[in-house]
Amino acid sequence: MVLNYIWIAFFLIAFVVALAKLVIGGDTTVFTEIINSSFASAKTGFEISLGLTGILSLWLGIMKIGEKGGMIQAFARLASPVFSKLFPGIPKDHPVTGSIFMNLSANLLGLDNAATPMGLKAMQQLQELNEGKKDTASNPMIMFLCINASGLTLIPITIMMYRAQLGAANPSDVFLPIMLATFTSTLVAILAVCIQQRINILQKNLLLFFGGLSAFIGGLIWLFNSLEQEQVSLYSTLFSNTLLFTIICGFIVSGVRKKLNVYDAFIEGAKEGFQTAITIIPYLIAVLVGIGVFRASGAMDFIIEGVRMGVAAIGLDTEFVGALPTMLMKPLSGSGARGMMLDAMNTYGADSFVGRLSSIVQGSCDTTFYVVALYYGSVGIRNTRYTVPCALLADLAGAIAAVTLTYLFFQQA
């Protein structure tokens, strides 16, 4: 229901703002821009779905081989001690645990093209376990979606690449703040859902997991700081893609050992990928059109200016307001937030306070509404329950952490 209200609000707020701009400001092009944006967003939604078709077919084919070869079940057993606590509604050693593990691992490595199909496969398996209404999100679905929307990634290669292209003296100087901000976002997402689902977060396995993850991130930060920027990009890309292809070959070998017809198993999974891509089209178009209309009306500009005036009125520093477009756009549109980040770096400079803050915000979380539309749309979920509020709370935590860390690390820069 929350997503329904937000979607309606996109259109009604856009209409009110556009009408005010027409009547008061004399802007005769605003409604034309809104309509053009709705058409362009619908086209973009279809093109994204079309682009996902090949990737989904590839990875769901690979996942089917791994499932029949027993590799997914092996991953499920590996992740069971932690996931059984975070996802108590999933039976022990169920294949979906392995799919979730694969998805989160791919996200950590920044392998988006692999993570999305794995996540959609996990959603299909979670839907099979959904004992309630099939159009209503289950508890494990909500936990899975919120962790995904928090966007935990170990090495933000793309952001550092953009900073290098725009002339940053040290493109990797945002690595540590991004790591801390996205860890904060993920932690808040998990805590929010645990509170809603009354999951005891003080269980031994969970405490060991978060402690181990914190130690691992600390070690990675130490290693990162000892390497040059070019070495970081080289080694992280090499490691990620080598690991990914090793997993693919491991799946194939597992199928051979089980004496499967590996080719037929791949085709079976690839067919599921094609069907999934078709299923998500209307959900993706609905969300992207709503966001596009909201942006084109100029409503976001009014929000940003209102925040700037409010912050100034209470005597706080307003330097961070220059990055607000990226903060507000991030939950709505990944490409939009990326454009806002690049615009901030072009306008203020890649090494400016705003340029760095925009980069940190971009890496602090994922695109909530896109993730919700894509993943829930793939299994026909309409009632998302408290998914969106928890995910947006994580986005807010990530944004606050990004601002705080930028002041801490770069205010005197």
Segments and roles (model prediction):
Residues 31-128, 258-347:
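Membrane-embedded alpha-helical segments and adjacent helix-loop junctions characteristic
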Residues 12, 59, 68, 108, ...:
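Short glycine/serine/threonine-biased micro-segments
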Residues 1-54, 161-295, 312-314, 386-413:
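Signature of multi-pass transmembrane helix bundles
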